[in-house]
């Protein structure tokens, strides 16, 4: 297993040496910078300020869980497109003593939610009703989730960990170029809501530009209340009052009772194996871990290394494995507290062998010919992710979200934070795609207090019981395939973590029936071959924003990589 590119020597952390662009089999890939390196702990998120805050916690003797809480609140301030206290997510935790657990702090549907709440009198979907505004929001889980993690595994107090976020909200921070782009892109949505316009645009109505200082006084006040009074301030106290009042005034349905009822859930992780490595990931209501394992199980029967990274054959079997997994996702996945999910069947090696037997090595299978399988017979995205490992070997993989960039676009008046639009992750009408193009069925229909299906895939990998990789990504429907490809790049193709993250990605999700590739990702001959095989190859924008840490089991040295696709 390589931890650095063969062509360069190990030098200090955060070096950014870039070499020439070179083809690798069927992929056009820029040669990667060396990974970041550390022996005392590592934090990888999409935002430098948040990384620095997390690392400071580790330097001051905090553990990975302490750092995860501090980073979560920091991202709510310095990464408002996705960092949040108005959304929810999932955490996978590995402790130094070998415990593996997951925490579900996904949003839930309000108590007044109904299966047809986004349909008109003729049964048609009301445009944007599940995407924009107060009615699109589920009951947030982030604040409860971060506190649940801290209470069980943390070593520091909440007030100490939130204080850096309060400081940046109170005093402001300099807007980056990428943040300025998103402010400009999503200004039309934010301007629709008076509180959001007040918080995220300048007083003259113009957008914040690169280098300007962005201050969030009301958010600082909200965070201070949480620091002083804990999650009860959010779910039962002053902040709950503000949320309920704003909902009532703007057509939303979240009530104080809904907030008071919210509870995060500790769940058993979904577990699998791949070529001798143990995969530990998030179980339902996230579909991520289940289908990462399902795809890897199918691929395990192919010699990917001999096929060649980026070759027509390797991309073909990968796309077919993805196609079958997403077909099953549409049929079987939902909130396990409301439906029975054939989980053991979906992740079984026998079921993977059955899928593999259906793959024609010479041609693509039309998605119309792929139906959800019978996994029970085998019983026996926008979002942000961060990965943290401490010097003792505790690790946290967290993906949390308000769904779309800037969520529903609606901010809570007087509280300074955006509400999610996670209700769009339900099947608002079976057979109708959501904003990510995903088609759902009755298993994911709206019900009061139900958790919507997710693709979030925080994942931890062990090798012979020792911590090996912490990985995850945002990206909506592409999260599953993004994380799976990074894992495969390391295990199958012997890439170091920077190369594995930088490598071009492909995506197939059953419906729509198209193979998505990144710009300049596949060489022309491979695209032509795949087209002849029957694929509709479509070039899309960047896929995912991985933050990953690879640990050398023999030395304990950590190697980290952020994603060059979406740097904030």
Feature roles, as predicted:
Residues 265-266, 380-383, 453-456:
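Short, small/polar residue-rich loop motifs at catalytic or cofactor-binding pockets
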Residues 77-102, 253-255, 395-463, 493, ...:
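Active-site rim segments in enzyme catalytic domains, especially the processed small/beta chain
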Residues 1-12:
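Bacterial N-terminal signal peptides that target proteins for export
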Residues 31-52, 64-65, 69-229, 234-236, ...:
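Noncatalytic scaffold domains of N-terminal-nucleophile
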Residues 450, 492-541:
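Extended C-terminal subregions enriched in glycine
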């Amino acid at each position: 297993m390589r931890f650095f590119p063969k062509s360069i020597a190990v030098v200090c952390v955060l070096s950014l040496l870039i070499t020439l662009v070179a083809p690798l089999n069927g992929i056009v890939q820029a040669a990667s910078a060396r990974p970041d390196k550390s022996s005392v702990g590592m934090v990888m998120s999409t935002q430098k300020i948040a990384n620095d805050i997390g690392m400071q916690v580790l330097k001051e003797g905090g553990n990975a869980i302490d750092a995860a809480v501090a980073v979560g609140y920091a991202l709510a301030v310095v990464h408002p497109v996705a960092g949040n206290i108005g959304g929810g997510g999932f955490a996978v935790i590995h402790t130094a003593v070998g415990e593996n657990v997951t925490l579900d702090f996904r949003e839930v549907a309000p108590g007044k939610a109904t299966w047809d709440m986004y349909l008109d009198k003729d049964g048609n979907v009301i445009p944007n009703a599940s995407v924009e505004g107060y009615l699109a929001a589920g009951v947030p889980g982030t604040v409860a989730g971060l506190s649940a993690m801290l209470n069980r595994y943390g070593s520091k107090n909440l007030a100490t960990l939130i204080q850096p976020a309060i400081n940046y909200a109170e005093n402001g921070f300099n807007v980056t170029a990428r943040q300025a782009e998103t402010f400009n892109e999503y200004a039309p949505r934010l301007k629709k809501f008076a509180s959001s316009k007040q918080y995220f645009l300048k007083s003259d109505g113009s957008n914040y530009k690169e280098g300007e200082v962005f201050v969030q006084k009301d958010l600082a006040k909200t965070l201070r209340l949480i620091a002083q009074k804990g999650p009860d301030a959010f779910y039962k106290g002053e902040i709950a009052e503000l949320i309920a009042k704003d909902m009532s005034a703007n057509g939303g349905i979240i009530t104080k009772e809904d907030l008071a009822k919210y509870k995060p859930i500790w769940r058993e992780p979904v577990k699998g194996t791949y070529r001798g490595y143990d995969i530990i990931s998030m179980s339902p209501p996230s579909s991520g871990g289940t289908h990462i394992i399902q795809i890897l199980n199918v691929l395990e029967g192919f010699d990917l290394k001999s096929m060649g990274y980026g070759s027509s054959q390797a991309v073909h079997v990968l796309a077919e494995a993805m196609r079958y997994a997403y077909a099953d996702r549409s049929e079987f996945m939902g909130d396990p507290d409301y439906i029975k999910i054939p989980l053991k069947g979906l992740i079984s090696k026998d079921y993977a062998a059955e899928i593999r037997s259906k793959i024609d090595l010479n041609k693509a299978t039309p998605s119309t010919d792929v139906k959800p399988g019978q996994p029970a017979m085998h019983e026996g995205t926008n979002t942000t992710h961060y990965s943290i490992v401490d010097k003792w070997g505790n690790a946290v993989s967290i993906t949390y979200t308000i769904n779309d960039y800037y969520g529903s676009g609606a901010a809570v008046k007087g509280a300074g934070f955006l509400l999610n639009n996670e209700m769009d992750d339900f099947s608002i009408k079976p057979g109708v795609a959501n904003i990510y193009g995903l088609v759902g069925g009755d298993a994911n229909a709206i019900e009061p207090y139900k958790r919507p299906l997710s693709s979030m895939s925080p994942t931890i990998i062990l090798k012979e019981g020792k911590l090996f990789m912490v990985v995850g990504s945002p990206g909506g429907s592409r999260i599953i395939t993004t994380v799976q490809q990074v894992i495969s790049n390391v295990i199958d193709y012997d890439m170091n973590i920077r190369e594995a993250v930088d490598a071009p990605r492909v995506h197939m999700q059953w419906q729509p029936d198209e193979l998505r590739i990144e710009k300049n990702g596949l060489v022309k001959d491979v695209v032509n071959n795949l087209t002849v095989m029957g694929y509709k190859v479509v070039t899309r924008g960047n896929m995912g924003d991985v933050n990953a840490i690879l640990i050398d089991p023999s030395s304990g040295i950590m190697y980290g990589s952020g994603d060059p696709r979406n740097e904030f």
